[in-house]
Amino acid sequence: MQCPLCQHTDSRVLESRSAEGGRSVRRRRECLKCNRRFTTYERIEYVPITVIKRDGQREPFDRSKLLRGIVTAFGKNGIANIRVEALVDEIEAELQQRALREVTSAEIGEAVLQNLKELSEVAYVRFASVYRQFQSIRDFVDELNTLKPPHHSSPDPTAAQELLATEAAFPERHPESSLLVNQF
């Protein structure tokens, strides 16, 4: 390893320890020429992942984009950033373990939804509404029904009617909604 001070290429390792949760190794080194000490980090270099978008375009996987989407889904829910980072780490590790270096945005979206379902139903629905491009309150009701435990009976008709009645009050936004109110 080249000394950052004198550029001599020989150094000895004084100490090594795991860093960044085991994702890197921190090494304290000493230059054999000038005796100065410096620190280096050794990390795994991952082969880049390519994301295939809905329209067929390909772009490099962007961890920060995934992180922003998940943070937005949680909103002001108060979940710790460390938990969101851990979730992104899990999803990224899952993608890195795949043999194929290309992944569809749909596969990433489903992985996020699966993880959010376990963490926060509110964040799950918020993410699903953008990812699945909800167009009406009915889409929300349908998604909420998938979250219910199977032993529950049908949805509360009063709550569903209130949701749909609210949508019916604004038919210019959702012309199909007037048909939905009578289904409950």
Curated annotation (Swiss-Prot):
InterPro entries: ATP-cone_dom, NrdR-like_N, RNR_NrdR-like. One of its GO terms (molecular function) is DNA binding. Its cofactor is Zn(2+). GO terms for biological process: negative regulation of DNA-templated transcription. Keywords: ATP-binding, DNA-binding, Metal-binding, Nucleotide-binding, Repressor, Transcription, Transcription regulation, Zinc, Zinc-finger. Residues 49-139 form the ATP-cone domain. A zinc finger (unnamed) spans 3-34. It comes from the Bacteria. Binds 1 zinc ion. PROSITE patterns: ATP_CONE. NCBIfam families: transcriptional regulator NrdR. Belongs to the NrdR family. Negatively regulates transcription of bacterial ribonucleotide reductase nrd genes and operons by binding to NrdR-boxes. This is Transcriptional repressor NrdR. The lineage of its organism: Bacteria, Bacillati, Cyanobacteriota, Cyanophyceae, Gomontiellales. The gene is nrdR.
